[in-house]
Amino acid sequence: MPPPPKRKWPNRPRGGGGANGSASGTPTTPRSTVAQQPKRPKVEDAAPAAEGVDVKQMYSTSAGNASAKPFSELSSVLDKSLLDGLDKMGFEFMSPVQQKVLTELPSLSSDCVVQAKTGTGKTVAFLLPAIQNLLAGNMPPRGKVAILVVCPTRELALQIAKECNGVTACLPRKMECHTAFGGTSRASNLKAFLNGNPTILVATPGRLDDILGEEHVRERFTHLKTVVLDEADQMLDAGFAPAVKKILRRIPPKSDGWQGMCFSATLPKEVLDIAKIVLFPGFTHLTTVDPNEVPTHERVPQYFLSVPNVGQTFAALSALIQEEHKQDPTDFKAIVFGTTANGVGLLYDLYKHALPQFRVFELHSRMSQPMRTRTTAQFKEATSGILFASDVVGRGMDFPNVGLVVQLGLPSSTEQYVHRVGRTARAGKDGRAVLVLFEKEAFFPRINRTLPIKPYPVDIAAKVPEQEAAITRAFANVEEEAKAKAYQAFLGYNKTFLKKLQLSTTELVRVANEYSRAMGCPEPPLIEKSTIGKMGLKGVPGLNIGSRRH
């Protein structure tokens, strides 16, 4: 069978880092992080994240687009200190969404719905009007929030805060930008918020809903001037609609006259319902989304491959990555999605030994927030490497120059599959996607015939035997506890798909035990009796009941 056609990749800057190295640079730390987010909808840490496009490069090189206008043309509209801040950041030309907002709104204080994709410069597009309105004579008293930005993830909140600090760097009066999201001490960060001067607050829905439950926090919003909902469709898609509606009931009412801005790539009914609360009738609708553009998941070449049993998927993934790298060895950058956080942790532990020639990263919900933030920054900056990830990055996160997305195991839904495919071929670049399944999971392409998924053109299954020895040696370096956690997560995840997998509970345990044998476990890892009961597997033969606590 012929090898897959070679891909023509855009020229990218070459850059450093050996195998398993770390990249330098982390996002700017905002002034406060208002702590631990309450339980969120079960979308494995729900969703999109920071705009990873190199915005500085985009704004400074837009001169190649004849319609792009320089920010300097807005000298009669924007305060000089804002223009100085943009210049200091290296932002010379407006992106299309910035140009739309800054030149087509009836006034910079007008309500609007703006359709724009992730990575197009939306952050600056909503920050400039909101901040300009404050500079025009609407600055709040010290300690009051004037601009509230609600976004779906902590990573995006950090990115917005970083750009905000850049835009406001040259203001004559310091303008603090605070953030509110989970992952740090609630008490200490809330104290920083209450003792500081949070003119701008960027928050995720769960954490913001939580802190607004306290009256002394609500009092900080009495001089609100602008409310921005960023990535509104992604936010509601992740299940945050109830929290967003509750937030809008707790802040001053729309009748107080604050400006509403809603940014969203699409406008489903749920977004329009929220927009009715945030916007006055007669709001302006702006869009930079081409209605005739082919969606990413339709234009990205997509393939699947399957192996007879689940234990062979580790060797199959190893063979696939090496085959893909052989086809495109320059700046090879890939994301491998696993089905569970503990499963992803196992993949990282395995392949840093099995594929030592590659620089590897991990990103999942079992990691601390500082570790996730650091990894996000490192993989964005990396010119090559493999990120093993769960769906903390499945929706909306934008890593530059990812040429390959691999999904290992059964996606939980067609929507999840599509969102993951969308992590490649960003910003007009090339990319492809491969789904790796074992025999029982191979129904997925058949029941999704509308998706352009084709058989992988190289017989990867035939290459499995030559990879198995290396996989066995690599697993000898993986801690037994990591294997046990991945085994238990495998059981729990696949228990929800028994009907689709056409497995009984006994057969599921048999498959899971094949999975554990492939990890080098002499017997199935121990599982607590209570955990087995919660999984609905009480009395199923083949399980090894006991405690792993020492």
UniProtKB/Swiss-Prot annotation:
Q: Where is this region: Disordered?
A: 1-51
Q: Does the keyword Membrane apply?
A: no
Q: Where is this motif: Q motif?
A: 71-99
User: Which keywords has UniProt assigned to this entry?
Assistant: ATP-binding, Helicase, Hydrolase, Mitochondrion, mRNA processing, mRNA splicing, Nucleotide-binding, RNA-binding, Transit peptide, Translation regulation
UniProt keyword Transferase present? no
Q: Can you give the residue ranges of the Helicase C-terminal domain?
A: 316-472
Q: What is its EC number?
A: 3.6.4.13
Q: Which Gene3D superfamilies match?
A: P-loop containing nucleotide triphosphate hydrolases (3.40.50.300)
Record: residues binding ATP: A116, K117, T118, G119, T120, G121, K122, T123
| Subcellular localization(s) per the UniProt record | Mitochondrion matrix
List compositional bias (Basic residues) regions by residue number: 1-11
Q: Which Pfam families match?
A: DEAD, Helicase_C
Q: Which residues form the Helicase ATP-binding domain?
A: 103-285
Which transformation does this protein catalyse, written as a reaction? Answer: ATP + H2O = ADP + phosphate + H(+)
**What Gene Ontology molecular function terms does this protein carry?**
ATP binding; ATP hydrolysis activity; RNA binding; RNA helicase activity
Q: Which PROSITE patterns match?
A: HELICASE_ATP_BIND_1, HELICASE_CTER, Q_MOTIF
Annotated organelle transit peptide span:
1-41
Q: Which InterPro entries does the annotation name?
A: DEAD/DEAH_box_helicase_dom (IPR011545), Helicase_ATP-bd (IPR014001), Helicase_C-like (IPR001650), P-loop_NTPase (IPR027417)
Q: According to the UniProt entry, where does the motif DEAD box sit in this chain?
A: 230-233
The record's principal subcellular location, in a coarse class, is mitochondrion
Q: What is known of its domains?
A: The Q motif is unique to and characteristic of the DEAD box family of RNA helicases and controls ATP binding and hydrolysis.
The free-text function statement in the UniProt record for this protein reads: ATP-dependent RNA helicase required for mitochondrial splicing of group I and II introns. Also required for efficient mitochondrial translation.
* Protein's name according to its UniProt entry: ATP-dependent RNA helicase MSS116, mitochondrial
Name the gene for this chain.
MSS116
